[in-house]
Amino acid sequence: MTFLRSLAFLIAQILVTPPYAIIALATFPLPRLARYRVISGWSRAMIWLAKNVLGIQYRVIGAENLPRTPAVILSKHQSAWETLAFQVIFPPQVWVLKRELLWIPFFGWGLALTSPIAINRSSGARALRRMAELGRKRLAQGFWIAIFPEGTRVRPGKKGTYHPGGAWLAVNCGAPVVPVAHNAGLLWGRGAFLKHPGTVTVEIGAPIDARSHTPESLNAAVEEWIEGRMANLCPVP
């Protein structure tokens, strides 16, 4: 059954994505936020399919912690699920991502129109300056900013290196940081075709005032909170 559900989801994804990419391209004349609301409908459709085809549901703990003003989300990264679900759970957001993702046919074209902060990871300090410049603009435009400090998907029970770029951005922009932990990787593995039914738990921490931190201390505080929650969400056997 899991195989058939996963196959049906993949087929639906293949059928839905190209026509939605055309819809996304048609949003080009719209204001950024209006454009985002239309394009993020694809992610909402994928989460609907995940629930009704794959049997993957989710619950959110700590939604009351979301500040009223745009913030920087620093989250655990385990699968593609959270990149979709966050567009349902959180206010309109942009992602800090590697620019190569924008080169993917259909998916990348639509992604480019959501106003992401696309950086060249190999350009070092120039990438940080670019991230800060675009970050301030996006926050002023009413967007939240979502970043995975580990930089890549990490298997449940494992921990990657927490890079300080997201904390550095928050400190430089004076934006609050919202730490997020989840266990999506237990059901939707990294690069896995098979996706298992169940309920993903997403935990949202209290916002952290970046203005009272250095990038290093903020990064450490985020890591401590996330990994503390992960011990319960993804206990090591």
Residue positions per predicted region:
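Structural motif marking the loop-to-transmembrane transition
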Residues: 1-11, 34-38, 103
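Non-catalytic C-terminal accessory region of glycerolipid acyltransferases
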Residues: 3-4, 128-237
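A hydrophobic membrane-anchoring feature enriched in long, contiguous, low-charge segments
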Residues: 4-29
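Catalytic core of membrane glycerolipid acyltransferases/transacylases, capturing the structured
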Residues: 20-41, 51-53, 68-124
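Generic preference for hydrophobic
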Residues: 60, 73, 95-96, 202-204
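Thr-Gly-centered strand-to-loop micro-motif
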Residues: 61, 96-98, 119-121, 149, ...
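Glycine-rich helix-loop-beta junction characteristic of Rossmann-like nucleotide cofactor-binding loops
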Residues: 62-66
